[in-house]
Regions:
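C-terminal capping/extension segments of zinc metalloprotease domains
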Residues: 4-5, 11, 28-95, 105-112, ...
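Bacterial N-terminal signal peptides
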Residues: 17-26
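Short beta-strand-turn/beta-hairpin segments enriched in glycine/proline and small hydrophobics
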Residues: 100-121
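Short pre-active-site segment immediately N-terminal to the catalytic Zn-binding motif
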Residues: 129, 231-248, 318
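Conserved PDZ fold ligand-binding element
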Residues: 130-164
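Post-HEXXH active-site segment of zinc metalloproteases
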Residues: 151, 156, 262-290, 347
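Substrate-binding clefts and substrate-entry loops adjacent to catalytic sites
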Residues: 233-235, 260, 281, 285-323, ...
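Catalytic Zn2+-binding segment of zinc metalloproteases
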Residues: 236, 241-245, 254-271, 341
Length: 415
C-alpha cells in the first residue's frame, strides 16, 4: 500500500512539475521585434479624436434624417389629426443627451470630448424656424424669453414651458374660447454662436406633426415605429444614399403612426388571443410562450407589440400585419408627395430590399411581397398624379380622420 501511494505521488509530482515548467516558459515568451512604443498621452489624445468623430458622425446622421423629415412633418399636419405640436426645428441637449446618443460612452468620456451639463444646440432641421434664424449646431442659448439660461437645462426647460403656456392661451383666444383674441406670440432668443458672436432672433414656431424621428445605431437595413415615433436604422441610412429614397421610408413609417396601426394591432392581438386561447388557457399560453414563442416569431418574421402569447403574436402578425403594411405604403405615398418628395421612383425603393432578402419576392409572411408592393405603390403614385392634374387635394381615399377645416373647405371646392 505504501509503495503504491508513493508511486502515485511521484507521478503526480512529475505532472505538476511539467505544468509549472510549461507555464513558466509561456510567461517568459516575449516579442522578437523592436516595435515602436506609443506614449500613453498620445494614445489618449488619439482616442479623444476618434470618440469626437464618432459623436459627430451620429449627429450628422441625425441631421440628415431630421432634414429629410422636416417637410414631411410640416406639410402633413392636415393628416396628423390630433398628433400636432408647435416646433422650432431645433434639438438642444447636454452631456447626458450625448451619452444617450452615443451608447457605450461614459459620462467622463463625453465630458472629455467637450460636452458638459450646460445646454447646447445638437441639431437644427433645414428649413425650420431655427435654421432660418441662423441658429446652428454648437450654438449656446444665452437668453430665452426673459430668462437668462446661465448654462442650466432647468432654466431653459422652464422658459420653453412658459412660452408654450403663453402660446396655448393665445390660441384659445383666437379660437374664441376666451375673450380678447390676440396674435400668437413669438419667442425672443439670444444665442452665442460657435464663432463667439451673439445672435438675436424672434422665433415663431411652426405647427407640425408631432412624431419624433430618431436614429438607431443598429446596422440592419430597416426602420420601424413603436406607434408614436419613427426609428431609422444606421444600416438603412448607409445603404440608401439618395435622400428621396430615405424620405419614402420615413413617410412609410409616418403612415403607420398616423394610421394608428400599432394600437390597432395591439387591440387585434388581445382579441385574437382571447379567441385562440380563451381565458382558462391564458396561463398555459404564457408558459408556452416562454418556451416556444420566440422561435415561432422568428419563423413567422413577426415583430408585434409585447404582452401577448407567442402563438397569438404569430397569428396576429401573419393575418394582420400585411394589411397594415399595405396601408402604410399607401398613406406613405401621400405623405411623401405632400412633403415635396420626388415619388417617380417610389416603387423601386422597396425593391432594393429584395436584393438583401430574395425571399421578399415570394415568401414574406408579414409584409406584401416585393412585386405586389411595387405594383401597389405604382398604382398609388398614378392616383396621386391624377389628383394633382385635376387640382385636387392630396388626401388618401376614404381618409377616416378629420383634417383641418380649411382643407375640408378646399376639398369641397375641388369636388
Amino acid at each position: 500500500m505504501a509503495s503504491f501511494f508513493h508511486a502515485g505521488l511521484g507521478r503526480k509530482s512529475n505532472w505538476l512539475a511539467g505544468v509549472a515548467a510549461f507555464v513558466g516558459l509561456a510567461a517568459c515568451a516575449t516579442p522578437s521585434t523592436s516595435f515602436p512604443v506609443i506614449p500613453e498621452a498620445q494614445v489618449q489624445a488619439a482616442a479623444l479624436i476618434d470618440q469626437r468623430a464618432s459623436v459627430e458622425a451620429r449627429l450628422d446622421r441625425l441631421a440628415r434624417v431630421q432634414a429629410i423629415a422636416w417637410p414631411l412633418l410640416v406639410e402633413n399636419v392636415g393628416l396628423c389629426h390630433e398628433r400636432r405640436a408647435d416646433r422650432f426645428g431645433i434639438s438642444i441637449g447636454n452631456d447626458r443627451t450625448i451619452r444617450s446618443l452615443a451608447d457605450g460612452f461614459t459620462l467622463e468620456q463625453v465630458n472629455a470630448i467637450g460636452y458638459d451639463a450646460s445646454p447646447v444646440v445638437l441639431n437644427v432641421s433645414a428649413g425650420s424656424p431655427a435654421a432660418l434664424a441662423g441658429i446652428v449646431r454648437g450654438s449656446v442659448p444665452v437668453r430665452v424669453g426673459g430668462t437668462e439660461i446661465n448654462g442650466e437645462m432647468k432654466a431653459l426647460n422652464g422658459a420653453l414651458a412658459d412660452f408654450t403656456e403663453l402660446r396655448e392661451k393665445a390660441k384659445e383666444a383666437d379660437r374664441g374660447d376666451v375673450e380678447g383674441a390676440s396674435e400668437l406670440p413669438v419667442l425672443p432668443v439670444v444665442f452665442r454662436q460657435p464663432d463667439g458672436s451673439e445672435l438675436e432672433a424672434d422665433l415663431a414656431p411652426e405647427t407640425v406633426c408631432s412624431i419624433p424621428i430618431n436614429v438607431s445605431e443598429r446596422d440592419a437595413v430597416n426602420a420601424n415605429t413603436g406607434g408614436t415615433s419613427v426609428n431609422m436604422f444606421r444600416g438603412l441610412l448607409t445603404y440608401m444614399q439618395n435622400d428621396d429614397d430615405v424620405a419614402i421610408v420615413v413617410a412609410h413609417e409616418i403612415g403607420h403612426v398616423i394610421g394608428r396601426h400599432v394600437p390597432k394591432q395591439r387591440r387585434n392581438s388581445y382579441t385574437s388571443g382571447m379567441i385562440v386561447w380563451g381565458v382558462p388557457l391564458a396561463l398555459g399560453a404564457s408558459i408556452f410562450d416562454g418556451f416556444f414563442g420566440s422561435a415561432l416569431e422568428r419563423w413567422a418574421g413577426v415583430e408585434t407589440p409585447p404582452g401577448q402569447a407567442g402563438m397569438t403574436r404569430v397569428l396576429n402578425g401573419v393575418l394582420g400585419t400585411r394589411s397594415f403594411e399595405r396601408e402604410a405604403d399607401y398613406i406613405g405615398m401621400y405623405v411623401a408627395a405632400r412633403g415635396g418628395v420626388d415619388i417617380s421612383n417610389a416603387e423601386n425603393v422597396f425593391a432594393a430590399f429584395s436584393k438583401l432578402s430574395p425571399t421578399s419576392t415570394y415568401g414574406v409572411r408579414t409584409h406584401p411581397t416585393t412585386p405586389e408592393r411595387q405594383l401597389a405603390i405604382k398604382a398609388a403614385r398614378e392616383e396621386i398624379e391624377a389628383k394633382r392634374a385635376a387640382g385636387e387635394l392630396l388626401i388618401p381615399n376614404d381618409w377616416p380622420f378629420p383634417v383641418p377645416l380649411e382643407e375640408d373647405a378646399a376639398l369641397a371646392e375641388t369636388n
